[in-house]
Structures are given as structure tokens and as C-alpha cells.
Amino acid sequence: MTDRLHPTRTIVTGASGELGQAMARQLAQPGAQLSLWGRDGEKLAAIAAQCRAQGALVNVRSLDLTDVAGAVAALLAEDDACPFDMAIFASGLGDIRAQGALVEDPAQVARLIQVNFTAPAAMAAALAGRMAGRNSKGRLVLISSAAAFHALPFAASYAGSKAGLSRFTDSLRIAMRPHGVSVTLASPGFIDTAAGRAVPGARPMPLSPEEAARRILRAAMAGRKGMGRAHLVTPWHFALLRLFDRALPRFLRDRLLRSLAPPGW
């Protein structure tokens, strides 16, 4: 990574996950200040040690983003202490309905929506307003999923929460652009992580966490006047699948999406 891809102070949520860890490693260099948030304290400590070995100054915060108000308060407190140049909201939960069930568990639906949509949207909104008022503008990166493009009957809460985040991010980008704040939406396909491999079903064209992180960070720094790409879909094949989904008659699309469920689901 080149120096221009390393903002001075960055927060990465989901930093105990494999994608978030890859983001942190690629941002870590002498002079970089990283705030790494995640659920797993042991994994946070391990990635923090790696980033410090690369010369970065690192602090960690272990928390559950289902406490949305607490997460926003903690974010603003850290921003008060030392303003963020960049925020990467990479936290997320993935799940499908239980085998044999007609619908997903209501408590799990609520949890996925809080972690995948409500928390990152609220945190991004809180930070965007502050960044807009600064002389040195900031960057926001929100990680959605190619699953947001499709109505997945066996993963309604995951696809739905990511779709909500995608529309929110695009709306925020339009609102913030006149104020010089860059907002990038990333919609990766399958990322080869332990959590992803635990979910039954095919995973075509998987990206390693390191490659996904590299593509997302480059997209965040690209574009006219360095304002970042509005939307990264990677691998590009998933953009074609999105168009295919839109072009199909509804009855054919519904039949196809039902057929994607793992056997027995």
C-alpha cells in the first residue's frame, strides 16, 4: 500500500473478524493511529500487536454493537479526544434460517439488523456530521454485501439488513459530497473466512480477506479528486448477477432464488 492510502487516524469496527483484521494490517505503518473495535477481546489484542509491530499506534475497544447508543457515544468520545480521518465500518453478522424452519428466529433477525444496519448507519451518521465541519475532510467506508442485491428466502435478515445499509450509504454519500466527505459503499461477494465457511451452501469466486481489504481500501481512495468510488462490487461478476436479477421476470427470479437454498433448507 502507498502512503496516500494511509489516513493518519482510522477506526475499524469488526476488527476481530478476518476482513477487519486484514484492513487493520494494511493500514498499519509508522505514524498511523488505529482504533480497533470488535467483539472478541483476544483477537483484538492479537491484531493490535501485529499492527504495533508495523509501527502503528493502536487502541482497542471490545464491545457488542447491539448496544447502538453505547457504540455511538463511545465513537464520539474517541473522536472528541482525537478526530478521525477515516472510519471503516466492517462489523457484521451472517446467518441463515435453521434447517427445517419456515422463517428465521425473531431474536436473531433483530440482532442481525442491529449489527449489520442500525449500528453502522447510526455511527456513520454521527461521524459524517462532524467530518463535514472540519477543514480536513474525512472518509467513511461501509461494508455491505452482494447478498443485498437479492431477495434470499433462506437469509432474509442478512440480505435485508445489508440492503438497508446499502441504500443508507448511497443516500449519505449524496448528502455529504457537497461538504467534501467521501462515502464509499463496498459490496463484496464471498470472502473466504471461517465464519463464511461455517454457513452451508456454495461460495463461488471467493476472495481472501487480504485481497478483499486491498480492493476496498483502494476504492475508498480512488475517484475524482480522491473522493473515493461511490460503490465497489467485487468480484465484478456479482455486478452482472445483480443486473440479471433485475432483468428476470418475478416468477422466474423467485424460483431461482428458492433453488439457491442449501439442500434440506
Short names for language-model regions:
Residues 124, 161:
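Active-site helix of classical SDR
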Residues 185, 201-242:
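C-terminal helical subdomain
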